[in-house]
């Protein structure tokens, strides 16, 4: 498997997805996985599909064509990237109440959402003095990169976003009826659902970046790029740089926070055991458990290296 050029596809679609069809698609994807090197994560719900998958191009094509038959060949938002290595261990398929959890069942992006803004027009919108820009991602994602002058709601998860809107959004608006509200996220799904929430609450000029940060970085040359830092992704790569290559961050396997090269040089950092974000979060028993886990990981790496050399 080493040296293969893997295709990584992030995709989502909001559409009415019936229970029997969800189970049918799940079973067909498992069949494809059994016969091919397919990995990633799918989340299915009655509101649609959300997922990121990794495989060779021909396998990806099979999966996309299959999914399109369930979405009636429309509204499947796709972002493509490549990697020399697999970015997931295996394929996971989860069936949930929502494909991205906001916790408000009546929010339905397939019926009413904000206005899509493509990458080419995004810079103009966010430079407009009558526009506020909101990063709808989690605080640890925002911490490693975001758009210039964007507002950070500082949420731990997306389900906290509605409360932030109720408590804080109006304080950022000069006029609820005339101020532009531009929102973005990694691939477009969270900001799309966020626009539906705001439209339901009566906000009028609501926009979201089509395809999210990933599409923007793919479309806009570096010299015109207004995104600063790296973009967090939910796979082994941890973060992507401005060229959509693997970035400089790693994950602290104790707390899950992204840690930079500089963070790893701090005295608090112990690989797999703790970082400066979580040094006060865990007990000594926890750390002993983390240390043993890291030793097992290191042993497996050595064994796998020997196998490949042979």
From Swiss-Prot:
It catalyses: uridine(34) in tRNA + AH2 + O2 = 5-hydroxyuridine(34) in tRNA + A + H2O. Its EC number is 1.14.-.-. The active site is at residue 185. Residues 127-225 form the Rhodanese domain. Keywords: Oxidoreductase, tRNA processing. Catalyzes oxygen-dependent 5-hydroxyuridine (ho5U) modification at position 34 in tRNAs. PANTHER family: RHODANESE-LIKE DOMAIN-CONTAINING PROTEIN 7-RELATED, THIOSULFATE SULFURTRANSFERASE/RHODANESE-LIKE DOMAIN-CONTAINING PROTEIN 2. This is tRNA uridine(34) hydroxylase.
